[in-house]
Structures are given as structure tokens and as C-alpha cells.
């Protein structure tokens, strides 16, 4: 273990050795829930099959193909990469920018995260909306990373406003 002299929450995000790979949580790992209210996708959780269907039939997100079973690696230098697509970008975090009783900080990225499309309820289903570059960090500890973003770009945020959630666990 290297000593980076960083707060524990940062080490939880990027790993004790300066690099950490996150993969999808075991269940309810991508979907919709409420801003300031839900800890994850409480309203709608997409399956791998639904995520794959989105990438197959929605040309705006077909570059995310394969990411429904992929992973994302973050490092101490602020770089991230997504497998299996190989997309790379940079990230910054701010653990002082919180939503009381709901989020522990914010994450900003220069490229889409793992399966980085937001979704919104449309009719009787859900559909991709935009590729967020700023996320609420709803939970970050050694075993969980939960990110959320407004379901639609530019939407007003108020309690229970629709948010897309991404839920990760460390890759073994």
C-alpha cells in the first residue's frame, strides 16, 4: 500500500494503490430514482439486456456497446478508462460539494463514464437522453460507488426529481 496522504474517501474512489477498477454492482446497478431521496435506482432498474438493446437501436449511444458488462478504472492522476471500449478521459472530484443527507460530493468527467448515458421515463418505458459530464457522488466507500445525474439535461433539481443512477463495486 502506498501512502498518498489523501482522505479515505478519495482512496476509496481511486484505490489504496492509486488505481481502482469499478464494475457493475450485483443488482439494480443502472436505472432511475429520485434526487435527494433515493440511494440508487428505486423506480426503474435496467437489465443488461435492456442496456444492450439501447446501444443496439439508439445510434447516439452505440459507442457504448459492450459496456453493460464492462468496467471503469480511475487513477490517482485523474485519468479514467472504460473497458471493453477503450474510451479514456480525465476526472476531478469535489467532496466539499454535497447535497446534505444525500450525496457526498461531485465527480466531473471529460468523456462518458462506463455506460455513461442518462435515461428518462418515456411513455411506458425508458430511453437514453444525454451523456452527463457531472455526477453527484451518492455513495463512495471501499466497496460501493454510486453516481447520479439528472435524467434529462438541464432539468430543474428538486426533491424527487428524476435522476439516472450508476452503481458500482470494486472489480475483483
What is each stretch, according to the model?
Residues 162-172:
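Short, low-complexity, Pro/Ser/Thr/Gly-rich segments in the mature regions of secreted, periplasmic
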Residues 51-142:
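Contiguous, well-ordered beta-strand patches that form the walls/edges
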Residues 37-55:
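Short, flexible N-terminal segments of the mature chain
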Residues 26, 110-113, 148-153:
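Short, flexible beta-strand-to-coil junctions
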Amino acid at each position: 500500500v502506498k501512502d498518498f496522504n489523501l482522505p479515505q474517501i478519495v482512496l476509496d474512489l481511486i484505490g489504496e494503490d492509486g488505481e481502482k477498477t469499478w464494475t457493475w454492482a450485483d443488482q439494480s446497478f443502472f436505472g432511475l430514482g429520485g434526487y435527494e431521496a433515493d440511494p440508487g435506482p428505486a423506480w426503474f432498474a435496467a437489465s443488461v439486456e435492456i442496456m444492450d438493446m439501447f446501444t443496439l437501436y439508439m445510434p447516439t449511444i452505440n459507442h457504448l456497446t459492450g459496456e453493460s458488462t464492462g468496467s471503469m478504472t480511475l487513477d490517482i492522476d485523474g485519468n479514467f478508462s472504460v473497458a471493453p471500449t477503450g474510451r479514456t478521459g480525465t476526472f476531478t472530484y469535489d467532496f466539499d460539494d454535497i447535497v446534505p443527507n444525500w450525496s457526498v460530493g461531485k465527480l466531473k468527467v471529460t468523456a462518458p463514464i462506463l455506460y455513461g448515458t442518462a435515461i428518462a421515463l418515456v411513455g411506458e418505458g425508458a430511453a437514453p437522453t444525454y451523456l452527463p459530464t457531472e455526477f453527484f457522488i451518492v455513495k463512495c466507500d471501499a466497496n460501493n460507488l454510486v453516481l447520479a445525474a439528472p435524467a434529462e439535461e438541464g432539468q430543474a433539481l428538486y426533491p424527487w426529481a428524476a435522476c439516472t443512477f450508476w452503481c458500482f463495486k470494486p472489480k475483483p
